[in-house]
Amino acid sequence: MRKHLGFTLIELMVVVAIIGILAAVALPAYQDYTKRAKLSELILAASSCRTGITEVLQSATGELPKAGNWGCESATPTSKYVAKIETDDSGAIRVQAANTKDTDIDGHWVSLIPRGTTDAAPVLGEAVFKWVCGNPKPVIGSEFVTDIPSKFLPGSCRG
């Protein structure tokens, strides 16, 4: 009787099937992770704008700047995945995604909207209590929305 060395055909087929199942489960999760990583760049781009708007809202004594005049907007790409940054009259920010090679993301927007203590747009001289990020529907004081599916947004930006 000969001693068997190596794997039999059945054992190899089982191993290949297991690897295939693991790949089928892991690949979509990895793809979602890379999309979230790319979108975190949009949140980072809005962060400097958010700081400036918060300072203006808390310290200004005159009239609030109008849409596009908060000093942090950009009509041209500012980084690899950021196409442009816009603001509205209430200080809400929206950032457009680009170059992610995904139709669910490219050309779509992520919004950050300042909220006062009453969950409405903050008034001049009032502290910004929180920033609402990733809102799929308009909130009081701003028409900006996030139209990127929430599963692709970073955890800190899911409404």
Where do the protein language model's features map onto the residues?
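N-terminal single-pass transmembrane signal-anchor helix
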Residues: 1-41, 45, 49
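Conserved hydrophobic/amphipathic alpha-helical signal-anchor segments
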Residues: 32-73
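Periplasmic/extracellular, small/polar-rich flexible segments of pilin-like filament-forming proteins
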Residues: 58-159
